[in-house]
């Protein structure tokens, strides 16, 4: 065979192999298409089938894997539907940890906001932590002087519950140095108070858009709850105060639908003082346990009906729950009048359980340190001192601060009642510690059907930071 014939033979064989390879690929593609086109009912391949029913309760997800079907029920919420929130509060035996953000510990080396007044509120699909930033980060020069409550740099922002208030995950909500927020089932509503002390303005946002305003009517630091507002069947309710912090002020209840104010009423409470109410839905009404910053060491109670009729008084229990306060043994309690004759105070909360009450308070009688929650038999309706349960959340060796209430809606929890939850703020820095800043983190607890052991879920940050040593 001459050289030309050898070249032709080798080329022919190579071309044949190429054609054969192409044919194999074509056959492989055809076989694959035919097998997949049969619907996968032979169970050879993994397959997920999602069936979306015309309900607001669930999506059924069926996963077929190696001839085995696994059915999961996934929470689903029709965003065009209002939450009900007319159910009763669940009766609980204790409170289990829900989340802890550890914001100050993380903030020593992370991009975490300087904050105060954190609170939690829930939609049908998630809970979020809201907080008032100081327009600055921990361990940064702009954190200097952030002990101040009101400034043009303060904003309301939020993250998913449990996340630190960091710059990467935080969502802007409103310009505010006082705020509240809640979800009606369709969208988030926020109320942010900002501006000068004598002419402050509260801007209502719905779905992230400004929809209404409330101007200061008494010209003396208009302010609101610093915790979740309350939505019932599409209408959202919150409480505002305007006037002195240490004597008679003026109080109003507001009602909004889709971010537009549709009603308001003045609360007549001569001799009593209401600030920073912690509110929650219960049996179709809004129940609030507030702060008396004037004289009382017992807490004001405000119960609001959908038509804005209200009942106002004090938490009856024969144990004080404000700080500072006197000895338990010397306190008698009252359902109608302030008791204890101690000025100042701290934001707190309580939950009605039939005629009983769960009431939170600092462990220290004189400072914002430690935190415990007590169940007092008949404490909602009588001046009872009978403690039937007590649970420690932060020990008295560690700082606490504000505390407040919220509930898990049935659409989120899957229960037939509203799960009572609370958060405890743990303030660090000025005025108690040698830093240039003031900030806080929080622990969040939710009611369960079991007793929960005492422990201390305190802040745990080691101070001072580098910025404090410069």
UniProtKB/Swiss-Prot annotation:
N-glycosylated. InterPro entries: Glyco_hydro_34, Sialidase_sf. This is Neuraminidase. It comes from Influenza A virus (strain A/Duck/Chabarovsk/1610/1972 H3N8). GO terms for cellular component: host cell plasma membrane; membrane; virion membrane. Glycans are attached at residues 46, 54, 67, 84, 144, 293, 398. HAMAP family: INFV_NRAM. Intact N-terminus is essential for virion morphogenesis. Possesses two apical sorting signals, one in the ectodomain, which is likely to be a glycan, and the other in the transmembrane domain. The transmembrane domain also plays a role in lipid raft association. Residues 89-470 are annotated as: Head of neuraminidase. It is an enzyme of class 3 (hydrolase). Residues 11-32 are annotated as: Involved in apical transport and lipid raft association. Homotetramer. Pfam families: Neur (PF00064). Substrate binds at residues 116, 150, 275-276, 291, 368. Residues 1-14 are intravirion.
């Amino acid at each position: 065979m001459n050289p030309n014939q050898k070249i032709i033979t080798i080329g022919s064989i190579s071309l044949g192999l190429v054609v054969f390879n192409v044919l194999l690929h074509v056959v492989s593609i055809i076989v694959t298409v035919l097998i997949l086109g049969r619907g996968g009912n032979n169970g050879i391949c993994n397959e997920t089938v999602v069936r979306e029913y015309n309900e607001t309760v669930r999506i059924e997800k069926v996963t077929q894997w190696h001839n085995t079907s696994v059915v999961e029920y996934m929470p689903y919420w029709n965003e065009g539907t209002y939450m009900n929130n007319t159910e009763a509060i669940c009766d609980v035996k204790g409170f289990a940890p829900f989340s802890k953000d550890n914001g100050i510990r993380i903030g020593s080396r992370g991009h975490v906001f300087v904050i105060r007044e954190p609170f939690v509120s829930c939609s049908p699909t998630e809970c979020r932590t809201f907080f008032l930033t100081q327009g600055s980060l921990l361990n940064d020069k702009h954190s200097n002087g952030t002990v101040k409550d009101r400034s043009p740099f303060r904003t309301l922002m939020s993250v998913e519950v449990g996340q630190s208030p960091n710059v990467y995950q935080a969502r802007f909500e409103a310009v505010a140095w006082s705020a509240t927020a809640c979800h009606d089932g369709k969208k988030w509503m926020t109320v942010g108070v900002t501006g000068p002390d004598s002419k402050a303005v509260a801007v209502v946002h719905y779905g992230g858009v400004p929809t209404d305003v409330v101007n200061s009517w008494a010209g003396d630091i208009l302010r609101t709850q610093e915790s979740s507002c309350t939505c019932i069947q599409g209408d959202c309710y919150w409480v505002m105060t305007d006037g002195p912090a240490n004597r008679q002020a003026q109080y109003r209840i507001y009602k909004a639908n889709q971010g537009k104010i549709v009603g308001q009423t003045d609360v007549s409470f001569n001799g009593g003082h209401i600030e920073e109410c912690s509110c929650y839905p219960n049996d179709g009404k809004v129940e609030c346990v507030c702060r008396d910053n004037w004289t009382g060491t017992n807490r004001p109670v405000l119960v609001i009906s959908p038509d804005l009729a209200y009942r106002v008084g004090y938490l009856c229990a024969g144990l004080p729950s404000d700080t500072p306060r006197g000895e338990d043994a010397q306190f008698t309690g009252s359902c109608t009048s302030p008791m204890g004759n101690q000025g100042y105070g701290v934001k707190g909360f309580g939950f009605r359980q039939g005629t009983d009450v769960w009431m939170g308070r600092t462990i220290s009688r004189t400072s914002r340190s430690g935190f415990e929650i007590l169940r007092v038999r008949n404490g909602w309706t009588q001046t009872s001192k009978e403690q039937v349960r007590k649970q420690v959340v932060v020990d008295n060796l560690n700082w606490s601060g504000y505390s407040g209430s919220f509930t898990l809606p049935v659409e989120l929890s899957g229960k037939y009642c509203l799960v009572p939850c609370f958060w405890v703020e743990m303030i660090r820095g000025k005025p108690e510690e040698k830093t240039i800043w003031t900030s806080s983190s929080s622990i969040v607890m939710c009611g369960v059907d079991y007793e929960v052991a005492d422990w201390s879920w305190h802040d745990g940050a080691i101070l001072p930071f580098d910025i404090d040593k410069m």
